[in-house]
């Protein structure tokens, strides 16, 4: 199956008073039709900046995409005209943002905010857009959908606001849905409801999903493949079951080791990754994880490893074979 989206060698920088921040450094990934790709990592690793760069949503200044490609349907999203990218954003590639509390306009009704993209991208009349908006709210599980179109965001709970955001993202039947930590501000019960809702809609509508999160528990039950980011780089990528069963990068091992397990003794201390994430004012020449890594060897401090395929579909950027206990050649 051909790739629906291919991102290659993406680099994004931010110019600040303190210096140049290298936020995304040569990130590459692909997405197939109907596939769910999870992008995981600590806060500040470049997850959100990667997809915002791809959709040209990085504020400029201070941000700038300095290299790379994002090929969708034969077009490079980074090079097409402003008008062309506007026709794709929201219609073909849609996005759910992190915080449902602030992502909706507080002075416009929910109906107005749902109807505008339908009239803009789908060419609907106001009556048609109103009917479609009510259908969308019903589809995401909001009762009394037509009546609630007249309500304002503050009249909805956090979970219901996130459902509205999902309805808005799905309004134009996108091929790709990008979910940027959509459950971060919600309690665990509502998180589970939102994840199940997205899974159901994915299966019904056949769309591809990029799900960005720091929560490996959510990704386990949602994604087909996982890319792990650290310091602006993808450092491991694998099918989800393979990654959880056989993590090969010390950072991935640390992330998985920090998860609480229901089958273990409740008195066990959770493991943690010592140290702090890298400061990105300088693009690292060595492995960015080396200062925090208990497996590090001499090459780790001299050269940044590239992603290499170690088994079908499983790529890792590490100088050490952590399972074999030896240095990679």
Give the role of each language-model region.
Residues 42, 178, 182, 186-268:
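P-loop NTP-binding/switch modules centered on Walker-like glycine-rich loops
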Residues 3, 143-147, 237-329:
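Short catalytic/signature loops enriched in Gly
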Residues 151-156, 160:
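Conserved ABC ATPase signature
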Residues 171-175:
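A short, proline-enriched helix->beta-strand linker immediately N-terminal to the Walker B motif
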Residues 65-76:
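Conserved ABC transporter NBD signature motif
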Residues 51, 55, 71, 101, ...:
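Short helical segment in ABC ATPase nucleotide-binding domains corresponding to the A-loop/adjacent helical element
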């Amino acid at each position: 199956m051909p790739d629906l989206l291919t991102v290659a060698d993406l680099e994004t920088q931010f110019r600040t008073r303190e210096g140049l921040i290298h936020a995304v450094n040569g990130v590459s990934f692909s997405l197939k039709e109907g596939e769910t790709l999870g992008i995981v990592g600590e806060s500040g690793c470049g997850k959100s900046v990667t997809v915002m760069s791809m959709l040209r949503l990085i504020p400029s200044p201070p941000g700038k995409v300095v290299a790379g490609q994002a090929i969708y349907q034969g077009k490079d999203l980074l090079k097409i005209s402003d008008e062309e990218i506007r026709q794709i954003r929201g219609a073909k590639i849609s996005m759910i943002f992190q915080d449902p509390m602030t992502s909706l306009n507080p002075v416009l009704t929910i109906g107005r905010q749902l109807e505008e993209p339908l009239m803009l991208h789908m060419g609907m009349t106001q009556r048609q857009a109103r009917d479609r908006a009510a259908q969308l709210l019903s589809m995401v599980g909001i009762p009394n959908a037509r009546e609630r179109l007249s309500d304002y965001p503050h009249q909805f709970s956090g979970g219901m606001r996130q459902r509205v955001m999902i309805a808005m993202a799905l309004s134009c039947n996108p091929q790709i849905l990008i979910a940027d930590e959509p459950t971060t501000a919600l309690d665990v019960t509502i998180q589970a409801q939102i994840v199940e809702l997205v899974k159901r809609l994915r299966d019904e509508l056949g769309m591809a999903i990029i799900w960005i999160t720091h929560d490996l528990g959510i990704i386990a039950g949602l994604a087909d493949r996982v890319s792990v980011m650290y310091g602006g780089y993808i450092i491991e990528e694998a099918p989800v079951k393979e990654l959880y069963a056989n993590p090969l990068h010390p950072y991935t091992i640390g992330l998985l080791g920090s998860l609480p397990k229901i089958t273990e003794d409740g008195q066990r201390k959770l493991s943690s990754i010592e140290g702090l994430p890298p400061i990105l004012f300088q693009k690292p020449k060595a492995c960015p994880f080396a200062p925090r890594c208990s497996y590090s060897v001499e090459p780790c401090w001299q050269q940044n490893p590239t992603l290499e395929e170690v088994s079908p579909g499983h790529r890792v950027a590490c100088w050490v074979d952590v399972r074999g206990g030896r240095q990679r050649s």
